[in-house]
């Protein structure tokens, strides 16, 4: 199962997210749930890097399917929009394939 956690500060502003695990929907190379989640997460990070003037840190473990993205400061309008867009896509995958394959959590830090 993939567990995505979106980190927020006490004001509800997004400050990062992590994605851990594999969906287990199908075998490697055929797992469309894993591919969809990966595409959304990586596209969000790449979009923030290319279109937003923010500092961030990324830690990734390709073998384990783990990635953690943390902003240096709470999300501004553009980076928050991109993170919210990723969340919308992840909720769509969760609705279509269920909680057996993806869990989306929000955590105040």
Predicted features by range, described:
Residues 1-32, 41-42, 47-109:
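N-terminal intrinsically disordered, cationic/polar leader segments
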Residues 35:
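A short mixed-secondary-structure module that forms the rim of ligand-binding clefts
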């Amino acid at each position: 199962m993939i567990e995505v956690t979106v980190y927020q500060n006490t004001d509800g502003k997004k400050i990062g997210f992590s994605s851990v695990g594999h969906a287990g929907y199908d075998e490697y190379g055929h797992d469309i749930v894993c591919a969809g989640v990966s595409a959304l997460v990586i596209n969000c990070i790449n979009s923030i890097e290319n279109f937003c003037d923010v500092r961030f840190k990324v830690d990734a473990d390709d073998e384990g399917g783990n990635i953690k993205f943390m902003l240096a400061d709470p999300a501004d309008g553009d980076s928050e929009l991109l993170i919210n867009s990723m969340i919308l896509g992840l909720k769509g995958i969760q609705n279509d394939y269920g909680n057996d394959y993806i869990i989306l959590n929000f955590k105040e830090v």
